[in-house]
Amino acid sequence: MADGTFDGIIVGGGYNGLTLAGYMARQGLRVLVLERRMAYGGATITEEVTKPGFYHNLHANFIWSYGPPHQDFELHRYGLELMRGEVERAYLFEDGAELLTYTDDPQRTYHQFKDVIPKADLDTMEDVYHRFLTKVEEEFYAPPKPTSERGVGLEGEDRAEYQKMCDMSGREVLDYLYESDRLKTWIAMNACVRGMPDFATGVGDFFMRYAASPRLSIVRHGTAQIAHSLAAFFHANGGIILTGSHVEKIIVEGGRAVGVRTADGRTFNAEKFVASAVDPPATFLQMVGEEHLTPEIAQRCRDWEIEYHTALFGFHAASAVAPDYSLKYSEEANKGLAIFFGVNTLEELDRHWEEIGNGHIPSALGGDACCHTVIDPSYAPEGGHTLLFWQFGPPADKLENGAKTYDDIKDDLLERMRARWAEYAPNLTRDNMLATYAYTPDDIQNRIINMVGGGCRQGAYTNDQWGINRPFPEAAGYRTPIEGLYMCGSACHPGGSIHFGPGYNAANVIVEDLGMERWWPPYRILGKPVLSRT
């Protein structure tokens, strides 16, 4: 006897699972979300890990200011408040040069960039936005297409050139478009912190998109509020979330997914669909079982590649001071939401990747950092500050080729990261650190078990795992070879980051398959260029 019967069951209560759940519940379906952890939200984790009153975003930190649920769910009514400062991103070079991206001010950004970047490259970047990106925005919030079918909003030579760039590696498209090493480094590092190495092939569209502003924000009171607001909308529409419910088995009968069984023996029936927000190996090899798969699908899951170059090591600190960069950089840099430093050239970035690929933490540290309290003082008690610095490294089991663990090196690495940051903001002394906390790749994969190896995107971005190949061709459109089973997590197009794309796209596909009329309107990104001449 089943413990409950629902129209749809979603495995995994991360933000993509909750996004799909909200759309389906508002559609009028009876929906159950099952989450292994005692807290839903997946990577949207905010905790007091240093001192009481200091709130730290342990995994997901930034959120895109656009995305369908913002308007469709009216998330502001459920407690979600996005915070944006005057400077969205500040990229600091060791020689004192800086690139400042001003929030929703592309003209000001253009004039600041032209002090560092040749005008021809800036004009090219703006042209990429208007010539290509404004006409292909719908590709992001839609099932992926093969290159030959992409760019339907473009004509003639523009479409051919766009398709040509889509098939390039990140580095190839940067070299194709731009001359300035600094601009190419700026784009490559922005892509890097989203888990996309510039050596990946067939991902050129990803690098083109940096001509458009991601409109980065942080969430007031922490990224956990994203999960709370999504769940509040879901609950308001009759949805049910059960935490502490690890799904052990997706029940397949006659080639169709008809329910799930949890590790503690409970069984839930699904009359219309089951959707998985977790990674392909766990979904298909563990939950579905190889007896229901073709040998080809089983092998694709075994071949699933984790993020070998972008495992995350997080430096979190409760600080007595906010970083002050003004000794070497402008006062404006102190207003930055996301701060990049430590990688000055593409050659340095190549060395970064090489060292990580050989199992080492880079000898010259570099990544992105954030002082949340510059934008939102609620992250810390009055007068205090919350700091975060992300450094990429090898996966948990590849560190020093398995000879060491992150626990072995975390204290030393924390101090190296503080000292590296202090090269740019000298006031970040040991004495000003009230408490520090290491969030290692081991911690990540132990908390979020489908972030295998301690990555941030639920699987590497490679030509074999991007676009129509993500997670693999037979499941790239959110439908899977198992009837009634769908994928909806970051292992699907368009990948990770809090843009809600996989959950939203899966909702569109499922409603179509059910023959229902969507309650929500078509979505169009209201984008802006990073920079503009006028």
Q: Predicted segment positions?
A:
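N-terminal glycine-rich phosphate/pyrophosphate-binding loop and immediately adjacent elements
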Residues: 2-134
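A conserved FAD-binding loop/helix module that cradles the flavin
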Residues: 490-511
